[in-house]
Every structure is written in structure tokens, then in C-alpha cells.
């Protein structure tokens, strides 16, 4: 088992990574505020792991479970209210702890419920998809979607602990594995060229679910994110680089309907667009852009946005992106291999060509 730490002063917490952790009560019980717990999961994960995991909390004064519908389309206020209903009906107080057993949707909604319930209670992240293990479970971003924008309603609320059981990836659908790889590749593009090169050499092993390769990819991804979050917890500065591909990607998700494109699929296409824009402006050379696109494709991800989306469609959603500052669009773009920046200094014609899929790269 590997242990990492997110260093945030009195809000610091560990990340445990290893096999068989779902069955280890010592990774959960010490992080409860009292003997009361609400486990939040979804229909898919509940059928696989719900009963055995819930048995860890036998003997609690209060132990309840709420099972949400599975899918991004249910990451909304209506589903969030199901969590609040369970808390109130079970008479949970400020000493309760919520436990998110599921992917990013479950984790984001559970964390937001924990941030809001009685103005803040503790929660534990138990991510069950590759994407949530390497990204959404770490860093304290929580929230729900709105028909007009993704993750526009939420809060920063750090978990008590993140428990990553690599065994759960054995039951992860192939499409979800590819979606998670988008966020793994992102870390190589924004912060670690050596890791990017390692991914190029090991992408086949990762897609074949090689245990050692997956554990290293998860560990390195979490370490990069933990380091960034420690510098900028509330995304007022450097943390925004974690959104590489997300401005384009969120536009795709919003336009296509939440869940029709998985988040990682949209981010994959969005990273291709970000690389192409940087290449058009001469920030990265064409060979590196082609390597990035090839790696994204090798992970089974789309490398182009939906043909139905026009530049106007993109701009409609990008105009309400959370990185917009004083009415100006800001993008996260690669500026050299293994490095990205947040900038509003991009060429408008190059952006138009990227959105319209016109013209040649560098």
C-alpha cells in the first residue's frame, strides 16, 4: 500500500492506494467523527460492493445508506436532495460522516452534501473509477450540474481521507477506464514530461489493466494533484492548470447532454483541441502535438469534438466557464512538453480555426 498526503494545514488528509482496502476497517473507522455514518453510492456500485462495504459500519449508533441512480445525468439538485432526505430522516447531527462509495458523480454530490448539511460535516472519499481515483476524489472540489453549466453549483470541502482500492478497477467497464486515462494523461501534459513519456511506453499495459502500471499511474497522478492543491486550494491561481482540456470538454458535455459523452471522453477531445491551439500559435511544435494526440487515441479516447458542434456552440458554453475573468475567456494551454499555463493571451484567429477544425497545424 502507498500513502500520500495532501498538505493543507489543519485540513490535511492522507490518500491510501492499494489492493483490498475496501475490506479494511482501519482505513475508515479512525476517520469518523462519531459512531454515525451515511454511505452514499449508486445502483451499479451497490450491487457490486454495497453490502460487504456497509458491513464495516456494523455497531455504529447510526448507519444508513442511500443509493442514487447511476450516471452524470443524475448529478443534479434533485438527486442531491435524496442525500439530505436520508440525513434528516435518519436524524444525523453535526458529528455524522458521509462516505462516498462511487465515481466522480457520487463523490462530488456527497462532498457537496457534506459541505452544506448543518453547515459542514466530514466525509470520506472511496473512489471506484479510475477518473475519480486520480482526479475528483482529491482536492475538495464538490458540486452538482445545472442545465446551463457543469459544476456551477458547489463548494470547496476537503475529505477526511481518500481510500483508493485498486481492485475495484477489475469491474470497471472499458469505456470508463479510457475516460479515466484522460485525466492521467493530463498530468503528464501539465506538469511532468517524464511521466508523459512513461505513459507513452506503458499505455498498452494500462489499458490491459496491468496492476503495477495502474498503481504507479494512480500514485503519480495523485501526487501531482496533491502538490498543486497544496499550493492553491481554492483555484485562485496555479490550480486552474488542472483544467487542461476542460473548457472545451465542459462545452461538449453541456451541448451533448450530460452522460452522452463521459467526462473523460470530453476532456480527451478537449486536450486535443488545446494542443492544436497551442501548436497553431507556435507554443508547442507539431511533433509533440502529434505525440499527445496519439497517446490520447491509444487510450481509446475521442480526438475530435462532435461534428454537430459549431464554433458558436462552443463559445456559448465557454462564455460561462468558471475561468472567465472580468468577461474575458481564459484557457489552459500547453506551452512546452510537460508544462501548461492559464492564459487570456491567445490568438483569436487560431482559436476560431481550432473550434472550426479548419486550416493546418504549425
Swiss-Prot record:
The record, for Pfam families, names: DHQ_synthase (PF01761), DHQS_C (PF24621)
What is the enzyme's class at the highest EC level?
lyase
**Where does this protein hold NAD(+)?**
70-75, 104-108, 128-129, 141, 150
Pathway it belongs to?
Answer: Metabolic intermediate biosynthesis; chorismate biosynthesis; chorismate from D-erythrose 4-phosphate and phosphoenolpyruvate: step 2/7
Name where it's found: Cytoplasm
InterPro entries named in the record: Dehydroquinate_synthase, DHQ_synth_AroB, DHQ_synth_fam, DHQS/DOIS_N, DHQS_C
**Protein EC:** 4.2.3.4
* CC per GO annotation: cytoplasm
Record-stated family: Belongs to the sugar phosphate cyclases superfamily. Dehydroquinate synthase family.
Q: What is this protein called?
A: 3-dehydroquinate synthase
| Species | Saccharophagus degradans (strain 2-40 / ATCC 43961 / DSM 17024)
